[in-house]
């Protein structure tokens, strides 16, 4: 028998919230005696703390999904009550997190004290064993010496010199200045070594700031310095050997100082230099998807996938067919057709002050684990100075939301590969303050498979995805190794550090009837913004009219005079002009009557008029600077030029006056503005 749905879900959640509050208050009161409790009791409190935190998070998730329509009877001040409950749950979550951190710190201090005591005991035992060894036979003594020598080599203190200044980032780090001599106590495989300075202060330091120290080399001539450099290179090789066990994916971040010296003579990759200098986390890489966009021409751009594809015989269109009964292009279902919402990115590491971030964004595409199967779609993120590690999407703006900021994306694919999924790559565009050099870095990536091992589509829900460092072709690389480094040695720290890992929140939404019908008019493979999907459909319908309905000879490959078909693909690479078209069409659509909106031919005719009146003048105006990604001044100048043009057109009821004005200067006419060469624009058949 099916369980009955609660009649008052909000009231039930509020009741559950009060129960959780009582449990949290009781746990906090009990924890006040933590200092006098046994370790087993503290562990029990910590486990209860984690369980309560999970229960609070579940309540928060359920609360977010609640709507007023879920209530069986009207509820007064619904939104206010919901907000109050959300605030209570947030407060409880903070209390539990603080309590967990407090307990874990106390345990960590006890573990460290216990370790010191064990080391003292071990020293005494070693002295006793040494005395006993002298009484043993000579052969046994030699055997024990052979066994002890590797251990002695590992714990032997090595002297290094600091190559730069380092300020402690967290408790336990050791602050030092350039030129300080440091004694290495323990070399850890994660790259953070335990060291002691000249004053005897111990702490963790990054090995990328160190170089072996040799007093004789300091007194020798420049020739001796060069020999010292060669010895340093050998030491770098030893470092690689030490970290090779279980850390092979981190090879790109090994021998950092050697890479810097090499960069001076061989001009190695800028990213390696930035990582060596500590300007970026070790897991950052040059953006893979950005390089594909730059180097592959048109192959991974939306304009390429928007064009029709020919059949194997090259005599017809494979994905653009005419529906004579409906009088328009035929809808085409695909294996994957869904809407994806980008919610937020959390705990994204910050780059250093030596580089200026120009843009934070996500690039996404369809991927099978080895190759990209669709266009690469880009969504720009926004952030607040108070929360610089959190990126959000679809901000509230005055007027229409720019399609570049729209976090709602449609995903379509007809690929039959069982490993089909969505590849997300977080990136930043930057400029180096010292050299003015520009570039794009990947801040992490994640691959979400769309089908399980049985070939069943994954459910439509919200996914919390933890990011990987490196490139999509590297495995096991962390975005910021310092996060997991802090979690070593304590189960409690490991559990808390999970929430500090860089992560991406996305939601997969299933389609309703209207959305499915709309997206089925798009190409079988395409990723794009939902806010511009209706404009892409207009283009495909006009493309079908021209290529399938109006051509007298379907075998003719002559050039076609059609400015919309010739120029519309340019809009996909100029999102601000696409926004101008969206705005103009929205204003025009608001003036149409309901009966007119149902007339498809009338809508297409009106769309063509709006396009001619808005887009064509902007594309060929000299007042509009060329589009350049992540150049703030250029983007601002383009926005101003577009806004001024739209304002004039609105005031003069059209763009004719602006076009005929002596102030309006346009580029020389080119035949490509009117000519549509559909064979030149056709996608090559992948089969």
Swiss-Prot record:
Q: Where does this protein reside within or beyond the cell?
A: Cell junction; Cell junction, Adherens junction; Cell projection, Cilium; Cytoplasm, Cytoskeleton, Cilium axoneme
Q: Which GO terms describe its cellular component?
A: adherens junction; bicellular tight junction; cell-cell junction; ciliary base; ciliary transition zone; cilium; cytoplasm; cytoskeleton
Oxidoreductase found in the keyword field: no
**Keyword Coiled coil, does the record have it?**
yes
Q: What happens when the gene is disrupted?
A: Mice are viable without renal manifestations of nephronophthisis. Male mice are infertile with oligoteratozoospermia. Spermatogenesis is blocked at the early stages of spermatid elongation, with degenerating spermatids sloughing off into the lumen. Early elongating spermatids are detached from Sertoli cells and show a failure of sperm head and tail morphogenesis and an abnormal F-actin distribution. Severe retinal degradation with mislocalized rhodopsin, disorganized outer segments, restricted expression of transducin to the inner segment and abnormal intraflagellar transport (IFT) of IFT57.
Provide the SH3 domain boundaries. 155-215
Spell out the InterPro entries in the cross-references.
NPHP1, NPHP1_SH3, SH3-like_dom_sf, SH3_domain
What Gene Ontology terms for biological process does this UniProt record contain?
Answer: cell projection organization; photoreceptor cell outer segment organization; protein localization; retina development in camera-type eye; spermatid differentiation
> What segments bear the compositional bias annotation Acidic residues?
118-140, 223-237
Q: Which residues form a coiled coil?
A: 10-30, 40-106
The record's keywords, sorted A to Z, are: Cell junction, Cell projection, Cilium, Cilium biogenesis/degradation, Coiled coil, Cytoplasm, Cytoskeleton, Differentiation, Phosphoprotein, SH3 domain, Spermatogenesis, Tight junction
User: What ranges does the record give for the region Disordered, renumbered to this chain?
Assistant: 111-154, 215-237
Q: Where would you say this protein principally sits, based on its record?
A: other
Q: In which tissues is it expressed?
A: Expressed in the retina (at protein level). Expressed in the testis (at protein level). Widespread expression, with weak expression in skeletal muscle, kidney, thyroid, ovary, lung, prostate, thymus, uterus, heart, and liver. Lowest levels in brain and spleen.
Give the multimer and partner information. Answer: Interacts with INVS and NPHP3. Interacts with Crk-associated substrate BCAR1. Interacts with NPHP4. Interacts with PTK2B/PYK2 and tensin. Interacts with AHI1 and TNK2. Interacts with NPHP4 in a complex containing NPHP1, NPHP4 and RPGRIP1L/NPHP8. Interacts with IQCB1; the interaction likely requires additional interactors. Interacts (via SH3 domain) with PKD1. Interacts with KIF7. Interacts with ANKS3. Interacts with SPATA7. Interacts with FLNA.
Its function? Together with BCAR1 it may play a role in the control of epithelial cell polarity. Involved in the organization of apical junctions in kidney cells, together with NPHP4 and RPGRIP1L/NPHP8. Does not seem to be strictly required for ciliogenesis. Seems to help to recruit PTK2B/PYK2 to cell matrix adhesions, thereby initiating phosphorylation of PTK2B/PYK2 and PTK2B/PYK2-dependent signaling. May play a role in the regulation of intraflagellar transport (IFT) during cilia assembly. Required for normal retina development.
Please quote what the entry notes about the protein's domains. The SH3 domain mediates the stable interaction with Cas and is involved in establishing tight junctions in epithelial cells.
Family the UniProt entry places it in: Belongs to the nephrocystin-1 family.
Instruction: State what protein this is by name.
Output: Nephrocystin-1
Lineage, uppermost ranks: Eukaryota, Metazoa, Chordata, Craniata, Vertebrata
Which gene name belongs to this protein? Nphp1
